[in-house]
Amino acid sequence: HVLMSSVSDGFSLLSYKGVAVVPIGKPTLEGYRLIFRDASVWISYKNTIIYVAGTVGLGFVLNVLGGYALSQPTKGKGIMYGFLFVTMLFSGGIVPTYMVMNTLGLTGSRLSIILLEATQTFYLIFAAKAFAAVPLSTVEAARIDGAGHLRVMFQIMLPQAKGMFFITLLNTFVGAWNSWYNASIYVPSDKTKWPIQLFINEMTSANVNFLETATPNYSRYLIQFAVIVVA
């Protein structure tokens, strides 16, 4: 429906009430033209790629290092699990998080978005459980051969837990690509740092307001469908 609506005639689509399985009226690419003639959409795509790459990369490092540390038979591991579990159930909240970011001087920067979305407690515990499932005999054999923590982690344990990390990376990627809420809080006025989803949210809202005017251009009604396909 969304794809067919995005290439339909705006006036005909506005009066159509059913599900579009074929283009309504004369097919047109007007909605896509209106989007891509604006340089802001390309800037938003660039920002989204930066956010996704930074979030996935940093999240991978944090999950691997944190998961490996939690999987080791060290004292106080149960207490650490308890702290992590509490943070998974009860977050600090938007205002305290914003105050921390503001104190660190990160508000208004891309780094604030990346740090907030890099990892979740669930992924960290998931990584620890995956590392703990690696046979202890394999790890001990590697250490007898002189392997240190980094070699054991990356060459012995990580390959055996790659399925878990693939799922984690995929979820992190999807979450980072679709994220817009943090950007609306930490970079609300700097459109040069907006991700594509926040840009689409503003464009769709502006399009709705435009259609409520006395003499709307019905071609712009296509934007709300075209931007979904583009995203």
Question: What does each of the following model-derived ranges do?
Answer:
Residues 1-231:
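A hydrophobic, multi-pass inner-membrane permease signature
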